[in-house]
């Protein structure tokens, strides 16, 4: 039961943070920058926590709870599909590229920073 409480509490925090951050970041040339921002921030934090040693309770609270609800693949997929549906082909491909490439760069930065 303790695990579920930590995950649920973290989920509440992450969802509130996601709403706050993503609603404050405007679209940039049709790119849903709010979703990109939360996914990039969440990826970097998750990478730092994963590559460092942390107690299992932190995994439940932060990695699964907070970051699981803070980041959002489903919104990324929906917003990207909407770009395609609206005929925004360049923005469609750019959004995919930015989300994947920047998040991979974020993981790499965290890994390299902790390897020094």
Swiss-Prot record:
Reaction catalysis annotation: fluoride(in) = fluoride(out)
InterPro entries: FluC
Any single GO CC term annotated in Swiss-Prot or TrEMBL for this entry: plasma membrane
Membrane topology type: Multi-pass membrane protein
Regulation: Na(+) is not transported, but it plays an essential structural role and its presence is essential for fluoride channel function.
GO molecular function, one term: metal ion binding
Swiss-Prot/TrEMBL keywords: Cell membrane, Ion channel, Ion transport, Membrane, Metal-binding, Sodium, Transmembrane, Transmembrane helix, Transport
Protein location: Cell membrane
Chain sites annotated for binding Na(+): 68, 71
Biological-process GO terms, alphabetical: cellular detoxification of fluoride
Keyword Hydrolase among UniProt keywords: no
Stored Pfam families: CRCB
Bilayer-crossing regions: 1-21, 31-51, 58-78, 92-112
Family to which the UniProt record says this protein belongs: Belongs to the fluoride channel Fluc/FEX (TC 1.A.43) family.
Protein function: Fluoride-specific ion channel. Important for reducing fluoride concentration in the cell, thus reducing its toxicity.
Name of the protein in question: Fluoride-specific ion channel FluC 1
Organism of provenance: Methanosarcina barkeri (strain Fusaro / DSM 804)
């Amino acid at each position: 039961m303790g695990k579920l409480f930590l995950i649920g509490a973290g989920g509440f925090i992450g969802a509130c943070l996601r709403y706050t951050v993503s609603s404050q970041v405007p679209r940039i040339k049709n790119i849903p920058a709010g979703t990109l921002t939360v996914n990039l921030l969440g990826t970097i934090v998750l990478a730092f926590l994963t590559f460092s040693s942390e107690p299992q309770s932190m995994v439940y609270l932060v990695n699964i709870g907070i970051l699981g609800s803070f980041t959002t693949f489903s919104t990324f997929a929906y917003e990207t599909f909407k770009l395609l549906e609206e005929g925004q082909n360049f923005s469609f491909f750019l959004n995919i590229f930015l989300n994947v490439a920047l998040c991979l760069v974020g993981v790499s930065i965290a890994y390299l920073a902790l390897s020094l």
